[in-house]
Amino acid sequence: MASVQDIGLSAAINLLSAFAFLFAFAMLRLQPVNDRVYFPKWYLKGIRGSPTRSRGIMTRFVNLDWTTYVKFLNWMPAALQMPEPELIEHAGLDSAVYIRIYLLGLKMFVPITLLAFGVLVPVNWTGETLENIDDLTFSNVDKLSISNVPPGSPRFWAHITMTYVITFWTCYILYMEYKAVANMRLRHLAAESRRPDQLTVLVRNVPPDPDESVNEHVEHFFCVNHPDHYLCHQVVYNANDLAKLVAQRKAMQNWLTYYENKFERKPSSRPTTKTGYGGFWGTTVDAIDFYTSKMDILAEQEAVEREKIMNDPKAIMPAAFVSFRSRWGTAVCAQTQQCHNPTIWLTEWAPEPRDVFWDNLAIPYVELSIRRLLTTVALFFLIFCFMIPIAFVQSLANLEGIQKVLPFLKPVIEMKTVKSVIQGFLPGIALKIFLIILPTILMTMSQIEGYTSLSYLDRRSAEKYFWFIIVNVFLGSIITGTAFQQLKSFLEQPPTEIPKTVGVSIPMKATFFITYIMVDGWAGIAAEILRVVPLVIFHLKNTFLVKTEQDRQQAMDPGHLDFATSEPRIQFYFLLGLVYAAVAPILLPFIIVFFAFAYVVFRHQVINVYDQKYESGARYWPDVHRRLIICLIISQLLMMGLLSTKKFAKVTALLLPQPILTFWFYRYCAGRFESAFSKFPLQEAMVKDTLEKATEPNLNLKEYLKDAYVHPVFKGNDFDRPRVVDEEESNPLVRTKRTSQGTTRYNSEASSSATTTPVANNDSPRCWGTKIGSFGCVIVVSYSC
């Protein structure tokens, strides 16, 4: 078991690493040549200009103003000065609420830490139990935990009381935060400027119709069922193959630019490359001519694929983005069932255009359930197969236990320096390496499930990552570490003593998690602000690919908050804090340092660096709240299991109401606040519509929305929001091919070969009829009389 010296060595290594990263960042950010790496957000907003312009050769690369080096740490107070309303306007509500999670950790754990150190640490330290257990490995750190309290001792009343205090305080803080974030979201939606997703719904599983194409069928359905609010629609094309060609052509363009720049710098000889994969083997050819011909071939293939998509009816998917004249009409459509058959004409709020994950719109709806079932099974096996490397990592953290099984390693293990490095540093860094490859796997699994927005993919990946951390990193570290450490004791002692050994050993894993917090939460956060990889990539691109100022702008990689990995990682720290607050309070100060340090770092990154891929209006908060409740319930269950091994089982029954009350609290919060994150109140929608009509009476919504949800490959390089045109276009009658079946006396007088449906001209007289549509839906048909 890691001792105080081991933890001290680990703390020294990680603190030195963190300070080294911070010092390097403070120096690098001051250099003009790195300005686009450490302040890209201001460049994207057009506020900041390049400091390398109008300077001498030396000052373009190095900052020679010594006064700036004196204030090299001024980025910290600057990160804290921007008020929250300004932060929301500058970076978006998603980023502002994400920062609040770190602040939530401080609000929750600072009072708990003070109380735990004032009450539980003296109770645990004076227990004097570990010395009386034979063949048990422990250190002075473990004497601060509940393991040092003798079984059946009345001292456990302090721990039981503390668990109730932690539960009520945590629930209070979570309630206040949920309420605050819900109000922030409602204010954000009320004050938000017009966006295409406010007026658009995504319609999926459009049923086939023998008389009409998908395009006509969608238009008919919404003209009839939403006659006063339907405006226009955009059907979804399967353009995945075309998107791959566009990506290949972009990659070829980068290589062509590289060789053209190389030729400009050295015009005496033309650059060459090889025709094999990556240019490493094959016939040597002229590089510029080779990539130019590649570009021409891909351009021809793109043109053929575009023509195929536009002319092939099979390329049109049974889905569409349908836009409405008002937010009120959009809310009604998005939040109601469109047909008596609940499996067709499925509507949901459309993600904003940059949030759409276009690849998954081409997946047939009937495949989604099968895909999600298979993904769930695959996730189950992934979680439990990952226990193998986790067990190996834990073996590194329990070398004393290995000595009992592999005594020939004892001479090496007993070397003081080797032992301290391995136990205090290696387990945390090894576990971190294993976890690096995991997010990519989980995101791929979420994409296979078929979700249609980047924000929802992040939320689903975060859910998978959270459960992976719970099972493998937390429970796996405790179970495998405990079993390996006490293997010999388990084989020699009576079966009735095994629960006692497990109960005593679980708190002793706090030392491992302390090392992990220092590696991931201290040094890892400091490495985040240094941005080593974006720094190197920017300078490589700037050297070999940049020809114009626009190229230099594209070479910047501002990055973004990766909710799929960062959220579960934060919640893991919440779990550790809640579990060990009443078990081993020594862990709490390390968690507080993490939350405080991460709050400053990520606030700086959000203000100066990150450019989010989408804005969901903090729609992920119910997931954050739910997972924190799960962490709280896990801590309660583990505390009950732990006390049941301490000859305190009868009194432990007093803890049974805790998880029940916590679940009731979760249900109450869900009923009270969750609708604010999934539905748009009709009252608020009407208010925004009324204000918009009063302030912009001539707004042409159809022009504003017509290109908003066109696949980006059909837009070229322009994926910006379409401009607002103030001149209203006329809306002609829509000619259809629908023939009447089961007609009434009104529509029997209408022409059966071709009918028209008024879309916008509400003054035209109408005749109404019904048609038995696909899957038995009765569709009312409107005709010009």
From Swiss-Prot:
Calcium-permeable channel involved in plant stomatal immunity. This is Hyperosmolality-gated Ca2+ permeable channel 1.7. Belongs to the CSC1 (TC 1.A.17) family. It comes from Arabidopsis thaliana (Mouse-ear cress). Disulfide bonds: none annotated. The modification Phosphoserine is found at residue 54. It is a multi-pass membrane protein. The chain crosses the membrane at residues 7-27, 101-121, 156-176, 373-393, 425-445, 465-485, 510-530, 582-602, 628-648, 651-671.
